[in-house]
Amino acid sequence: VISTNNMSRMIRVSLSVNIAVLIPVCTVLILNIRPLVDVWGPATPARGILLSMYLSILLLSAGLWLRRNPMLVAPLLAMQICYKLTTPITVGSLTNPVVISNIAIAIVHAVTLWLIVAHLRASAK
């Protein structure tokens, strides 16, 4: 049986990781801070779209941190796991710093998502 405390703790961890990572990342992208911004490439519409996605995840994470509803957290984490685990393929590298951090964060989110699903399944019985 998955305890509510373990699930809630990991939800806080995942959302906190999102917030802690995305505040500086969005700041770097918005202010075009060099040399850090070079990891994401030059300012282009594609980078603007990426920033929009990052800002959306940041805002959702902050809102969900205040109201930790597992049914709302689960789809956010599932989407992040998918996009983070596909970045090595789309970037074509396992050594890019963004790819490396994406894989690490996906692992954390996968544990959280597993706990949410296990808890919800146990609650449904």
Regions found by a protein language model. Give the residues of each.
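Non-cytosolic membrane-interface motifs at loop->transmembrane helix junctions
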Residues: 38-48, 75-76, 94-105
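Membrane-helix boundary elements
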Residues: 3-45
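Membrane-interfacial, low-structure loops and terminal tails that flank and connect transmembrane helices
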Residues: 1-7, 120-125
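Alpha-helical transmembrane segments
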Residues: 10-20, 49-52, 72-76, 97-100
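Membrane-helix boundary connector in multi-pass membrane proteins
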Residues: 67-100
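Membrane-embedded alpha-helical transmembrane segments of multi-pass integral membrane proteins
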Residues: 18-31, 60, 79-90, 104, ...
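Core segments of alpha-helical transmembrane spans in multipass integral membrane proteins
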Residues: 20-26, 42-66, 75-82
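Membrane-water interface at the C-terminal end of transmembrane alpha helices
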Residues: 106-125
